[in-house]
């Protein structure tokens, strides 16, 4: 279904696909008696394949615009997403829209449920930071003709609008800066390799290390689920029995602050003992210690451009996808210094 053709998949679509009557399909989907298991399974399979979603709202799908946009992100407690959500909501209100905000906790099943909830609320469009562990949620959006824009993450092989920052450049700048300070043993804490921003930041960091002739120890490239508990556990284990390192590149400010807290618990000072560089520059919008050296990208621009792009998609319907990649740069503050001699 073309983007912007906001038409829900109906029972008649399942009937056309399976050859069963609408009445039989309705009974199967409602798990009523009088339907063979084979027929029920065939109908359920077809319904899933074409993206059918039972509408939970009384009276069915409303016609016209609801003036509502769903914002779906991985972690609404993450300061980065809190900032972007706030900006998106403000921008939507300027255009007469209200927002519904949902979090996925990086779980694809929760992303799919959030999409189903958005469709059942008859939203006009979706701003989505995808988990990238599954395409099921995005497939539902496409099958139901729901306009959407990806924020902060992208799929290389997906025909969809997105607004991201130059993650590869940001990773390069972080690695280049630490290498120029003299660091050779750098711990890298990534998110999952399935996340485009994480993969691209690591690619840029690798490029910087290659240019400086610094070998990357695989034992110093770790994956975090971005939770405080996980980051603390990783630092605890490394300091007790892991390889030595003099600096840390964390793939988000959120992880960086948790890492600094863990280092301080072990009596290590930042940057006196260990240097730390983050990514996001949350402190461009919030003021709290420590002043973190980090990679900045324009969060306000990413948020406002995502809203503008989505509203344009809603108004104009099917067009070629728009891909926006915004610049990133290093912000030097107080958490990185040359390694101790």
Summary of predicted features, one role per range:
Residues 232-341:
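Flexible loop/turn connectors
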Residues 37, 41, 50-125, 203-206, ...:
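Amphipathic helical "hinge" segments at domain boundaries
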Residues 98, 106, 129-173, 194, ...:
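Flexible loop/hinge segments that line or gate small-molecule binding clefts
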Residues 163-188, 203-207, 228-236, 256, ...:
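Hydrophobic alpha-helical segments within soluble ligand-binding/sensing domains
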Residues 17, 22-27, 61-77, 177, ...:
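Short beta-strand segments enriched in small/hydrophobic residues
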Residues 1-67, 340:
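N-terminal helix-turn-helix DNA-binding module of bacterial transcription factors
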Residues 42, 79-94, 170-174, 196-215, ...:
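Short, solvent-exposed amphipathic alpha-helices that sit
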Residues 172-214, 219, 322-336:
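An alpha-beta-alpha
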